């Protein structure tokens, strides 16, 4: 005969008591019809999440209208225009989350390529979001069978540092504005920004070199910092400008530059290379006192620039073809053919105007080679040097030369 286990009776007794209490509570709180309504309402309220699997935050995001332009009116958002409707919604969600400095937030996009493309568009359109990590340092959480994700951009600075950097950027806007005369056209504004960036910063790798923070705060940056700062200042002055990333011929390193719009035409703008006097071949590069601004990269000849730099295929960029706003063209220093007397007269005119640097450019390789044979390998410069001594009453003068081969330009520094 099997023994009965007393704990089974205890369990049954407790279960019966629990049922009784439950019925009692139910009877005390609700009538049967009321309870049915309460349960029904709960199911209806949560039906979208129950059946779609989406959190309430995601469903709210999908209901929001997508603004066609920057809600703060700060940027032209060139790359936003190249996104499809779904991507544009994700673009706005990313900007809202970053501006609020949220550590993580939902996106209604989720595929890796899509999130990466949209985030890249945000970064290139918005240099003012300097406190966010680049796209190699973000984290994304996806969910099984879900078409949304949790995005964690990561931030580079404390709130105090962000305030310091923004104050430095605001100060830069005021300083560059002071360089622009009232009624200045867009080319004059572009030249002022180009000159300001080169005079302000040094090309130098640092922890802050990938954004405008490096330029305005640390005064050191690489191409990404220069291009972001240029975009920030030019858009502040009302000059249409976009940020461009691409590759460098003969190098594994990428490069960043800008494209600006002047009088309806598009031009390259590369302040990084303008701040690279070591690009010059010749003894002038050894002169510490000569930090020569290379204006060759302010509206350069497109075919010359494109021999070295190619934009990424991820997005399309405007085609540049005009040469009329090139620095040398505007200053009558670009020549289609070589004539010694013509070049000498140009040098004398520049020296008469007080120039310490004389530069001249050629539109053809043949003319450039002829000039190099006379002015670099020959002694054509001697006549210009004698003219310089006559102007300043000197018995001797020291001069140095530089050549920018890819731009077919010759420099002399007195």
Predicted regions and their residues:
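A short, structure-level motif marking secondary-structure boundaries and short turns
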Residues: 103, 214-217
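Hydrophobic/aromatic-rich core segments of domains that either
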Residues: 225-300
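Secondary-structure boundary elements
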Residues: 158-215
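N-terminal accessory/pre-domain segments preceding catalytic cores
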Residues: 2-182, 299-414
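Sequence-level motif detector for i,i+2 pairs with an aromatic at +2
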Residues: 146-148, 188, 264
């Amino acid at each position: 005969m099997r023994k009965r286990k007393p704990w089974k009776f205890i369990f049954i007794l407790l279960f019966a008591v629990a049922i009784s209490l439950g019925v009692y509570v139910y009877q005390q709180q609700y009538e049967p019809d009321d309870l049915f309504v309460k349960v029904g309402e709960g199911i209806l309220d949560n039906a979208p999440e129950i059946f779609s699997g989406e959190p309430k935050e995601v469903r709210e995001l999908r209901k929001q209208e997508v603004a066609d332009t920057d809600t703060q009116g700060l940027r032209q958002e060139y790359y936003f225009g190249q996104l499809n409707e779904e991507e544009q919604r994700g673009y706005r969600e990313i900007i809202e989350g970053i501006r609020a400095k949220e550590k993580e937030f939902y996106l209604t996009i989720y595929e890796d390529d899509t999130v990466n493309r949209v985030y890249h568009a945000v970064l290139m359109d918005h240099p003012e979001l300097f406190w966010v990590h680049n796209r190699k340092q973000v984290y994304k959480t996806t969910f099984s069978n879900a078409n949304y994700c949790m995005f964690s951009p990561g931030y580079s600075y404390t709130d105090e540092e962000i305030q310091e950097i923004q104050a430095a950027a605001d100060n830069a806007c005021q300083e560059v504005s002071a360089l622009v005369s009232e009624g200045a056209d867009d080319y004059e504004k572009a030249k002022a920004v180009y000159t300001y960036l080169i005079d302000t910063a040094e090309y130098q790798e640092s922890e802050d070199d990938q954004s405008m923070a490096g330029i305005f705060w640390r005064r050191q940056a690489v191409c990404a910092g220069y291009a972001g700062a240029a975009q920030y200042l030019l858009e502040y002055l009302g000059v249409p400008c976009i940020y461009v990333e691409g590759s460098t011929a003969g190098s594994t390193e990428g490069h960043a530059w800008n494209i600006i719009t002047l009088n309806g035409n598009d031009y390259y703008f590369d302040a990084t290379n303008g701040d690279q006097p070591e690009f010059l071949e010749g003894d002038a590069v050894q002169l510490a006192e000569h930090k020569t601004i290379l204006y060759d990269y302010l509206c350069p000849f497109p075919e010359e620039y494109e021999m070295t730099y190619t934009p990424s295929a991820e997005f399309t960029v405007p085609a540049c073809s005009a040469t009329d706003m090139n620095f040398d063209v505007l200053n009558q220093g670009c020549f289609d053919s070589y004539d010694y007397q013509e070049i000498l007269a140009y040098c004398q005119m520049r020296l008469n105007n007080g120039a310490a640097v004389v530069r001249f450019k050629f539109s053809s390789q043949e003319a450039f080679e002829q000039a190099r044979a006379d002015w670099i390998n020959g002694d054509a410069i001697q006549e210009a040097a004698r003219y310089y001594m006559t102007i300043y009453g000197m018995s001797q003068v020291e001069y140095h030369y530089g050549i920018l081969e890819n731009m077919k330009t010759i420099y002399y520094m007195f």
